[in-house]
Amino acid sequence: MGHLPDPRPRRPINSHSPDSRELLRVPPAWSTGRDLDRPPAGRTPGLRALLSSTVAALCVSACAVGPDYRPPETAAPNAWTGAGEQGTRLVSDAPATGLATWWTSLDDPLLTELVEAALAANLDVASAQARLRQVRAQRVVAASGLYPALGASADGRRANASVETSGRNVTADAYGAGLDASWEIDVFGGTRRGVEAATAEVQASAAQLAATQVSLAAEVASNYVDVRLQQALIRIARDNAASQAETLQLTEWRAQAGLASVQDVEQARTNLERTRAQVPALETSLAASEHRLETLLALTPGSLHERLSAPAPALAVPARLTVGIPADTLRQRPDVRAAERTLAAETARIGQAEAALYPSFTLSGSLGVESLTLGTLMSGDSGVWSILGGIAAPLFEGGALRAQVAAQESVRDQALAEYRKAVLTALEEVENALVALSNNQARDTSLVTAVESARLADTLARERYTAGLVDFQSVLDTDRTVLTVEETLAQNRADGVLALVRLYKSLGGGWSPGANNEPQGDAEP
């Protein structure tokens, strides 16, 4: 149920009355003040009244104070706008497919192996899995409050006392065993709201595990792309250095023949050494990316060097991609799911706080045997039992309980703001990735033409220099242009694959809903 009427007039939150709770113990009407007394035959009106009140409390306990959670409405656009005209061949509004294993679309067996190995061995994933196990156990703890607690005990004792009249010592034995039970009846639903919050926390933790897997797959792929980029840049630098070494040799021959100056020779040497100097810096970046991959796979540095050094196919963006509509993306994104489940948990905790404003009801009892000898412990006359009902109600708390409700409502409002922020961030990231991917394709077309033209210009400049038709500066300029545009093309193609990785990450790729076997509840926005 929703809010129950408040049992007391509201006080301002800043009230300064002292805190206290009055515990009203209500013994059965037949009790003589001793727990082990039995009621006289035929006289159990107190027991009947207690049982009646218990049944009534159980009926009321079907209700729960506090707001009932409803998922917030989220206005998502009908389609993505970031693709633009250049991207219409890359994306569509058909349902996204293959998101769970998107890295296989790059057709690189080693990349697929690395991502799957990371998902199995990564320490961040292991930590998130442990966190999920923790909150599952905490939910069991929360749910245990709905049931009675039962315990068993046994004891034996011997006492010695001196009798003044006779001057003798008297020794007495006593033995006992029994069962004790206690139960706090969840009349106003505070415990059930706690279970509701704990269930939502389990679902949020499962979504956070999925978010960790999504981020991990993207990070492994990004570092793998960077490894291949650094390797490509090293090849480009070495190829250009080889070409520039030939130019230096040609210039030296021409200088010996009196057709070139010493200045031309030194300029050619400078150009060559500058290109060679790029290689160590690129190798440093390559090693860093390899080491990062090894850390993501929980491996020691150097474990993957041999495999990553083997030739591999060039990574390329598929000719056509499919992305779902924005609403599908919001349902797929685990971080959005986690934020929504956190909101549900904080909403349930408002009911927990409100339940503290109302009385609490407890039942306790014991059943056992007591005897002066072990031989008679299990005889029919050794049985003892007791039952006790209690009620505790808050009277003066200085506004603390109401302040706790207000504080929890503020926590709920924070969770709502975080959820809305997660939704907007998800939409932003997809749009940015689509724009980057679209523009990258357009840039790639121009760069391919630029590389072809630069190589042709370099060949013509060398031929004309050999024929003595141009000075050496023309050769230097075309050499530098070739190196620059080839590096730019390699970087742009890597950027295209990285944009694809970011797109799949922003779409929530890298996990399957239900893979953690967690109930989804109202997880959909």
Region locations from a protein language model:
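Terminal intrinsically disordered/low-complexity segments used for targeting and assembly
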Residues: 3-6, 49-120, 175, 199, ...
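Short flexible linkers and secondary-structure junctions
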Residues: 7, 64-219, 360-365, 388, ...
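Bacterial N-terminal signal peptides that target proteins for export
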Residues: 10, 14-52
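Membrane-embedded beta-strand positions in outer-membrane beta-barrel channels/transporters
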Residues: 115, 176-180, 224, 269, ...
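Sec/SRP-type N-terminal targeting helices
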Residues: 126-127, 143-144, 185-213, 263, ...
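Periplasmic alpha-helical coiled-coil/stalk elements that build and connect Gram-negative outer-membrane
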Residues: 191, 207-325, 436, 440, ...
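A short glycine-centered flexible hinge/capping loop motif at secondary-structure junctions
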Residues: 255-259, 465-469, 506-510
